[in-house]
Amino acid sequence: PGNEHIGSFGCDSYDISGVVVGKGSNGSLHGMTKFSMEDMPSNHFFLEYIARPQTAEIFFEEVLMACVFYGMPILCENNKPRLLYHFKNRGYRQFCLNRPDKRYNKLSKTEREIGGIPNTSEDVKQSHASAIESYIEKYVGVDFLGTYRTAGDMGDMYFQRTLEDWAKFDISNRTKFDASISSGLAIMANQKHLYTPTKEKTKISINFARYNNSEKVSRIINK
C-alpha cells in the first residue's frame, strides 16, 4: 500500500450472504488518517460505508476497491475470514494487516496466511473499546479546557451513524454495533505501535574462571 503512512481502514465483515429478514448485521468499513507530514487532516475519519449488499462478494469487492483506491491497508477480524481470503485470492494479501499485539513468529499458521485480528480475546476487546474512548476524548466535541486541542476548538467527526453507534456501544454485546467495530479497528490500525509487545531482554551471565598463578601450581580463585 502506497499510503500506509497516511492512514488505514478498519472493517467489520460478514460471511453469509442470505439471512432471515431483519436478523443480519451490516458490513461496515471506516477509513481514517493518522498523524503524518502530508498536507491533509490528521486523525480524521474520511470514509464511512455501512451496508449489506445482495451478496457478500459484492461487499468484499467494494472494500477491496476502497483499499486500493486510497492505497491504505486494512485491519479486520479473522474469525470471519472470507473477506481476508478474498483479498488473498485477488493478490492483495499485503493490504491485510497482521494483528499488532503479537510478533510475526508468534502468529498462528492462519494468521500468517491471511492476516487479521481475533475478536474473541478479552485483551483485544478491551484495547478496541479503549481506542474508541480515547479517540472520542481527544478529537470529538468541544475541548473546553484545551487539553488536547486549542481551548474551545470543535472536533470534526462528520458521520452521524458512527457517532450514534458509539453512543450506544456495549462492550459485553458487540454484535450489533457494526460501525463501532470497524471504526475502532481503524483507530487500532493507526496506533499499531501502542500494541506491539515489548521485547524481553534477558541478562546473559558469563563467569570466567580466574586462577592464582603466584605459586608453582595454578589454583582457581573461589568467589
Give each language-model segment a name.
Residues 1-98, 138-223:
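RNase H-like, metal-dependent nuclease domains and their acidic two-metal-ion catalytic environment used
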